[in-house]
Amino acid sequence: MEIFIENIQDKIEITDEILELMEKAIKMCLEHEKFEYPYEVSIILTDNEKIREINYEQRNIDKPTDVLSFPIVDMYDGVIKSSQGDFDLDEGRIILGDILISMEKAKEQSMEYGHSFERELIFLLTHGVFHLLGYDHDTPEREKKMFEKQEAILKSLNLERN
């Protein structure tokens, strides 16, 4: 498995402990789903301005958001629908996709919701990972299922709501 985390913002300090927590959370999401394939996932930590630009380019919404996911493999609720995904043939890995997280939004929302920055960051990260795995919140049932999965990971990491 390969996890790439790139920090392209300078507004919020990202410590080694935060990076380790992020990697652990990603691995836990995939283990929770019993994802058996070698994989690659890229995380980009950005600021409000950059995520606003990308949100506008990709979704025609001209405002910053907290997290954006760009899945590469066609999945639905954790199951690969098509084998036409992107594979790294040299390494034999499935490239799941990219997740962008606004560190400014994560900080703002942690203060708004009254919990730690780490909890909010990992909530957003797991949200993005489950989107890469084909989960969505487009119906009440699917939303409940997705958020239950996120909360299970947060609970395992002792990052429950206060």
Swiss-Prot record:
Subcellular location: Cytoplasm
Any one Gene Ontology molecular-function term assigned to this protein's record: zinc ion binding
Cofactor names: Zn(2+)
Keyword Repeat: no
One biological process term in Gene Ontology: rRNA processing
GO cellular component: cytoplasm
Presence of keyword Nuclease: yes
Annotated Zn(2+) binding sites: 127, 131, 137
Protein name: Endoribonuclease YbeY
Organism of derivation: Acetivibrio thermocellus (strain ATCC 27405 / DSM 1237 / JCM 9322 / NBRC 103400 / NCIMB 10682 / NRRL B-4536 / VPI 7372) (Clostridium thermocellum)
The organism's taxonomic lineage, starting at the top: Bacteria, Bacillati, Bacillota, Clostridia, Eubacteriales
